[in-house]
Amino acid sequence: EALAARLAAVVPRAEDDPEAQLAPFANPDVARRISAMIDRDLEVPGAEDVTARHRPGPRVVEWEGSTYLLPTVVRCDSPEHPLANREFLFPFAAVVEVPAETMPAVLGPTLAVTVLTADEGLRRRILASPHLQRLNLGPLPTWQVSWDQPHEGNLFEHLYLRRALQGLSGAA
């Protein structure tokens, strides 16, 4: 609820505004189709757009000739809901309460995960998962990037395995 209230306050601003947090869609129809897709999936029982309670208007907005999708937080009752494991081209989060023992398998493949826990066992399981492209341990913003992250362009590290190798001469 608190996250939804906070994100509902994010609105379009001028691109040179230091407080700007949203990017406009180059093609307004893409924004409308994404919003319509979310609305269709919200018709499936077990999910609610929590930000809608805090937002003064619709998810799609026109501002100064550009089209924006406002941040959206959806709460799902189950990881099987169609919106529970979706990623979109705008600030979107699906919140699903699940037992820690089901993590990270319940996540499935994903581009970015932020882990906020002191449970070392859970952190180790999530670190071992091959399905997570980007993993933030702690409250790091997902937009904070580093050049040496494979997802951000350092393909050498991503494509080639570094390995220390030692051996004795003549050893088989």
Annotate each PLM feature.
Residues 1-15, 38, 42-45, 130-134, ...:
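Structural signal for hydrophobic packing residues in well-ordered secondary-structure cores
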